[in-house]
From Swiss-Prot:
Organism classification: Bacteria, Pseudomonadati, Pseudomonadota, Gammaproteobacteria, Vibrionales
CDD domains: AdSS
Protein name (database record): Adenylosuccinate synthetase
HAMAP family: Adenylosucc_synth (MF_00011)
Cofactor descriptive note: Binds 1 Mg(2+) ion per subunit.
Pathway(s) annotated for this protein in UniProt: Purine metabolism; AMP biosynthesis via de novo pathway; AMP from IMP: step 1/2
Keywords recorded for this protein, A-Z: Cytoplasm, GTP-binding, Ligase, Magnesium, Metal-binding, Nucleotide-binding, Purine biosynthesis
UniProt gene name: purA
Keyword Cell division in record: no
EC number, as in UniProt: 6.3.4.4
GO cellular component, one term: cytoplasm
Amino acid sequence: MGNNVVVLGTQWGDEGKGKIVDLLTEDAKYVVRYQGGHNAGHTLVIDGQKTVLHLIPSGILRNNVKCIIGNGVVLSPEALIKEMSGLEDRGVPVRERLFISEACPLILPYHVALDQAREAARGKKAIGTTGRGIGPAYEDKVARRGLRVGDLFDMASFAEKLQEVMAFHNFQLEHFYKVEPVSYEAVLEQAKGYAELLTSMVIDVTNELDAARKRGDKIMFEGAQGTLLDIDHGTYPYVTSSNTTAGGVAAGSGFGPRHLGYILGIAKAYCTRVGAGPFPTELFDEVGDHLGTKGHEFGATTGRKRRCGWFDAVAMRRAIQINSVTGFCLTKLDVLDGLKEIKICTGYQMPDGSIAEVSPMAADAFENVTPIFETMPGWSETTFGAKTLAELPQTALDYIKRIEELTGVPVDIISTGPDRNETIIKVHPFSA
């Protein structure tokens, strides 16, 4: 299938991508983030030690891996430096292995102020953003007024551009949202403080990755959030501000799309969602509470409680269409241990009585569907920490097989716990 693997979420994010990227990068030379920002929360557990990464690619804990932040990522210098410091305090040589595209848009304090002011103004209609400035930074990029990492090479020009964009945003903050403006002088001084560090990490990402491809190096592209949060294909407007799908890889890194190989879709054995937006299989009973408690379903970035529900094969089919998913990694199978019965959503009944086999695009249409469930027997045995299929109960194997039948895509990897070695690999993406 080739040396270039994409790992992305096929639900509403929080599927367990970080662990899988860390696991598979034993064989990789590069790990590339291509979209999102520090609104991502990728949790790794290695020999019992927990690491949460928000911006730096999950391959950073591997000595053999170069990590790249591509142009599709909106970069908060403050968040990056904090994350780097935490890793360096543990002896991880981040500066030797982390590289940045000069085309990365910068997230600056006025983006955060705007994000939070807007969410407050929306009241009950709030989207549920992380409040970290992601959306406003992407807006500035599209409006062609955003500042980028490359602008830090010329601080005189940077200061001039900053003054112009801050005048625009501070007017909104003061006169529309009725909150305090952000200090231009403070932001400029901040930028001067991290300019040298950021510019020292800049490389020509497209050239680097193309050279790596020609050498035959293994490259992994690490997605953030999930397909159903994609700005174009997700449950709009309850979405993130970037393209979280496989199509975002080329645009967000400059890597030629023809060279992409295996697309690994990450999916929980059930579904979760953080914040507002439609969620057809959501559970409001003790089973939902059980999934949330046993699965430790609290956001790595925000700490917010995640909503929990049954596995949704209908939404999954849409994710497969969009991403050309080669194979799945099914995570958190062990969370289903002990349930007497398990349900899978196999179709949506639409308001007109018709049955949909793939999910609708818009949030309004999503809100009006009635999920159709198939009930399967659960299992009392533990699957936690299983490393071979032989260790799984037959009913768990039947559940996995049914997901494969309903989606038409094989489950190639099964995660049975948070540690990197608590995994069953049927097919390795780099060997497929």
